Amino acid sequence: MTDKTSNQMWGGRFAAGPDAIMEAINASIGFDKRLAAQDIAGSRAHAAMLAATGVITDSDAEAIREGLLTVLSEIEAGEFTFSTALEDIHMNVEARLKEIIGEPAGRLHTARSRNDQVATDFKLWVRDQFDAAEAGLLALLRALLGQAEAGADWVMPGFTHLQTAQPVTWGHHMMAYVEMFGRDLSRVRDARARMNESPLGSAALAGTSFPIDRHMTAAALGFDRPTANSLDAVSDRDFALEFLSVASICAMHLSRFAEELVIWSSAQFRFVTLSDRFSTGSSIMPQKKNPDAAELIRAKVGRIFGANTALMMVMKGLPLAYSKDMQEDKEQVFDAADNWMLALAAMEGMVRDMTANRDSLAAAAGSGFSTATDLADWLVRVLGLPFRDAHHVTGALVALAESKGCDLPDLSLDEMQSAHAAITEDVYGVLGVENSVNSRQSYGGTAPAQVRAQVARWKEMLA
């Protein structure tokens, strides 16, 4: 296939070919060649429909079908020469098709515009990426459930402001991420369902006078229905924006978890040990084992956020219907999708392979006066104090323990009673971290029984 000096697909009204700079800024084949399989699938469905409705002959449709299969095989084998003079994947495919089958190739674009063609191609590609994201999220959720089930009763500190707050369990913390990524899964499925309408047959913007069957092409391409308004169909990039929005929310969750894994795997915490398979070393410091996968997830999230913002900026000022600005939609989505899928896979691998250090978790669980709230609750429940009074008494005891360099359970009964005379020996029963987590039996709480129930619920949902 040879480069063309002028575009034979639209050049009839032009006296000269485009300037080299115009050709460079106008061409998108450098990136939209990723849509080749989707473009050919859409063209095959369109040709079959044109034959079924009598717009083209069966013999032309068959020639087009066979020719498109040849083009696809050339692309997949790396034997296809892409031309910047032909601008985009649509014209590159059609030009090569003409070289293979001749005149029937010119009938393929009947009742179709590149406007509905690219919208269809892009939707098909984004739909595939939603499916890939669903698979990645399911794998990650199952890895998290495995961690949660194994550590349903392993105590660890819960944090607010990255300061010790209350004891929780490892399983409870893992289930928090199950809930987050579970919402991401729901958003993926919801957005995929909403976008599954076919733009094909909308033509440039107003539809077509040919007797086409848009329901036929929609069904052939796996869409639920054709779009209801041709003008909207070619103007719409909501599906791409929603993809990026869903990806951004999920990426934010990935980044938060990645940050915790970086902290937890440090020598100062030792909460988790990341496997060698998801760590790297240092070129100068032999002792180093760096959580680079987690750090790179955290960084790649910025690219996903940037893509979301960039496409919003592209679309914000465009009148209906198509404007060439919309050519700038794809690179953002391609890059975000690549990084999202990679981040999901890396996180799933880290979670699956990592080891939670139960002893380190338990040692940290009781530090920082983590059972102070349990003491305040005991004062309310047993002594009948108003919670604000109980809060004040407990704060005084924390200050006393801090001044002595000890934890709350290390205070003597006399010292306890110095803050409130009615405190009894029974108070020590609520100051242990195991008792604390076991007492949190409210629905969704950190008690091991609650954690196991939530694990079972999610396993059933994902079965």
Curated annotation (Swiss-Prot):
Principal EC category: lyase
Annotated HAMAP family: Arg_succ_lyase (MF_00006)
GO biological process: arginine biosynthetic process via ornithine; L-arginine biosynthetic process
Localization, UniProt: Cytoplasm
GO molecular function: argininosuccinate lyase activity
Keyword Lyase recorded: yes
Keywords (A to Z) from UniProt: Amino-acid biosynthesis, Arginine biosynthesis, Cytoplasm, Lyase
EC number in record: 4.3.2.1
Signal peptide: none
Annotated pathway: Amino-acid biosynthesis; L-arginine biosynthesis; L-arginine from L-ornithine and carbamoyl phosphate: step 3/3
Gene Ontology cellular component list: cytosol
Name of the protein: Argininosuccinate lyase
Recorded family membership: Belongs to the lyase 1 family. Argininosuccinate lyase subfamily.
Catalysed reactions listed for this entry: 2-(N(omega)-L-arginino)succinate = fumarate + L-arginine
